[in-house]
């Protein structure tokens, strides 16, 4: 029997729900209470839809990560989590636990890396994993075993659709972001080359390494920019690539889900 692990990108879900309540109620206890209730109902719905054998909610610790250590500008300019919501997270985690779902958070690792590590381990065991998030960074993980589900659109992100939309393969995504950067995370990439230029280079040469090789002896304007900012591209790729080698300290059996409402 194939197991199905449901991984909730908890802050991705909670912050979007809180943003809706915040518009209606401001940063008030009413907004927090509504968020707690709505988030719990969302989790119930996800469990009902996907019928997982295993499940976990992964939270960010909000502490500086290894990405901040090698690139201090990482995520500069992002709005911090509202203090009221931050104070309410333990109660949300407790509600998740009451539904039979544990929460995972560590001081050393970002939630995205923890999620990637969990998903990778499941895929290597030929089991099924469903990540619930709107974060495009998880596109790089998509394969036969790992799926991405957008709760707010009530739909899966399909690999073929990503390919058609982006114009490149899943395997080329990190090379693409290494060139274009990711503005929402303040990752610069190669200045002067946007989406169109990055696509052109990857469609022609296939990979970032091949682009570097071609740039060595070329007068092409795009390749010249790549050559002069090669270190930026290498750093950007390191930043956008999710880690899958974190020692978690637990096994899949520890995440088994049993419906506590029965």
Curated annotation (Swiss-Prot):
Region spans: Interaction with DNA: 192-197
Binding site for Mg(2+): 112
Residues covered by the 5'-3' exonuclease domain: 171-258
InterPro entries, per the entry: 5-3_exonucl_a-hlix_arch_N (IPR020046), 5-3_exonuclease (IPR002421), 5-3_exonuclease_C_sf (IPR036279), DNA_polI_H3TH (IPR020045), FEN (IPR038969), HhH2 (IPR008918), PIN-like_dom_sf (IPR029060), Xni (IPR022895)
GO terms, molecular function: 5'-3' exonuclease activity; 5'-flap endonuclease activity; DNA binding; magnesium ion binding; potassium ion binding
Amino-acid positions noted as binding K(+) in the UniProt annotation, renumbered to this chain: 179, 190, 193
Cofactor dependency: Mg(2+); K(+)
GO annotation, biological process: DNA replication, Okazaki fragment processing
Enzyme Commission code(s) on record: 3.1.-.-
Transmembrane segments: none
Signal peptide extent: none
Keywords recorded for this protein, A-Z: DNA-binding, Endonuclease, Hydrolase, Magnesium, Metal-binding, Nuclease, Potassium
UniProt cofactor note: Binds 2 Mg(2+) per subunit. Only one magnesium ion has a direct interaction with the protein, the other interactions are indirect.
Pfam families in the cross-refs: 5_3_exonuc, 5_3_exonuc_N
Database matches in HAMAP family: Xni
Protein's job: Has flap endonuclease activity. During DNA replication, flap endonucleases cleave the 5'-overhanging flap structure that is generated by displacement synthesis when DNA polymerase encounters the 5'-end of a downstream Okazaki fragment.
Family: Belongs to the Xni family.
Record's protein name: Flap endonuclease Xni
Species assigned in the record: Psychromonas ingrahamii (strain DSM 17664 / CCUG 51855 / 37)
Lineage: Bacteria, Pseudomonadati, Pseudomonadota, Gammaproteobacteria, Alteromonadales
């Amino acid at each position: 029997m194939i197991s199905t692990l449901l991984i909730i990108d908890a802050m991705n879900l909670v912050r979007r729900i809180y943003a809706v309540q915040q518009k209606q109620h401001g940063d008030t206890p009413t907004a927090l209470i509504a968020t707690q209730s709505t988030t719990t109902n969302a989790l119930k719905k996800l469990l009902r839809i996907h019928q997982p054998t295993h499940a976990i909610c992964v939270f960010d610790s909000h502490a500086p990560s290894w990405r901040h250590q090698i690139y201090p500008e990482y995520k500069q300019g992002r709005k911090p989590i509202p203090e009221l919501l931050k104070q309410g997270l333990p109660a949300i985690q407790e509600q998740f636990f009451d539904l039979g779902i544990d929460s995972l958070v560590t001081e050393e690792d970002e939630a995205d890396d923890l999620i990637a590590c969990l998903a990778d381990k499941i895929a290597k065991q030929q089991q099924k994993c469903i990540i619930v998030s709107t974060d495009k960074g998880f596109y790089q993980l998509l394969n036969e075993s790992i799926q991405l589900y957008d709760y707010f659109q009530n739909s899966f992100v399909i690999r073929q659709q990503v390919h058609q939309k982006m114009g490149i393969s899943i395997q080329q995504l990190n090379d693409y972001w290494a060139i274009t950067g990711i503005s929402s995370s303040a990752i610069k990439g190669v200045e002067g080359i946007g989406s169109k230029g990055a696509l052109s280079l990857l469609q022609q040469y296939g990979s970032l390494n091949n682009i570097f090789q071609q740039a060595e002896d070329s007068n092409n304007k795009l390749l010249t920019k790549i050559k002069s900012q090669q270190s930026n591209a290498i750093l950007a790729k390191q930043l956008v690539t999710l880690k899958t080698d974190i020692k978690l300290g637990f096994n899949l059996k520890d995440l088994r889900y049993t419906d506590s409402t029965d």
